[in-house]
Amino acid sequence: MKMNKHYNELKASYLFVDIAHKVAAYQEAHPEKEIIRLGIGDVTQPLAKCVVQAMRDAAAEMGTKEGFHGYGPEQGYPFLKQAIQGYYASRGTQIAEDEIFISDGAKSDLANLLGLFDVDNTVLVPDPVYPTYVDDNVTDGRKIIYSRTGQENGFLGMPDESVKADIIYICSPNNPTGAAYTRAQLKAWVDYARKNDAIILYDAAYECFISDGELARSIFEIEGARQCAVEICSFSKIAGFTGTRCGYTVVPKELEREGMSINKLWLRRQTTKFNGVPYVVQRAAAAVFTESGMAEIQSNLDYYRRNAKVIADALDECGVWYCGGKNSPYIWLRCPGNMKSWEFFDWLLENCGVVGTPGVGFGECGEGYFRLTAFGDAEKTKLAAQRIKTAIKAL
């Protein structure tokens, strides 16, 4: 038999393996020192109480003859889809129930959506980039081109009219840089996509961190986006579902290519290859959008926002350039002293006992930059920020 040779084209990812080895070596050499991890991309606050209660109630319901649920609708139960509709409507965006598809997370949908598109399409991704965008397309054999970003454009790449792309990845607020597009910038991308008959895959996993009312929480706040974009969303960061697994994707009915409805194709794909998200999980997700759920979730988000401000304030005191933090859980900083990304990693670990993520691990344009996250413990984040501030000032 023949294998998919494109898997052999995947670059070996040593980023987090190397981080783990370096941290282990440091701990062995300095067993008395406490290491603070600010490189984690996972949440640390527990699920909201109302979410846990909803799971308990749904599990108990499943234990009764009257309340048992077997296979559910592949595209999600109406009660959750309607709750998501209300979430969009509360921000002034109207989405139809049959445009919402419940999934086991954004990462799955980002990969599975590609099955609707031919492998001859050209893909445009930013650099630095969330590695999954690249790997998903390498394994399909698509051509990938990069939108190079840097300090000069705030790590927000803009359309290049000399470049023709068919599939465009946008993540705003961005992972890893924390940068967020303005409405005007998103409109430029929408116009570019429509002009080139391209489709935007809009990763909105971090929209819940946006506190600036001038920034869009959804691509569908932008005129024309319903004709060129799919929005992929997650419960992981808004509600701490990284270990529970639930997300959703919005596919507008207006979105068509070559006379085919992307909405209908995605429905067919899901009903063919996916059996849906468990009833208990969907009940938990629906609880997120209740009045008490939103209040509890905001409390957790504020916890992470305070952590981000603590880190940002420390960098401000040191005069270190950074982006993100305000509308994002990620702080993307310029390595002080013109250090390279891994050089700064070693320096930070040795001098501060703090672990972050070297920017070069996200692409060539990440060299000389570094990612810190706000997902840690509040007291440890304060301690880490103080250590970083003291050490940088002593450089």
Show where each model-derived region lies.
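Helix C-cap/helix->beta junction micro-motif
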Residues: 30, 140, 195-196, 318, ...
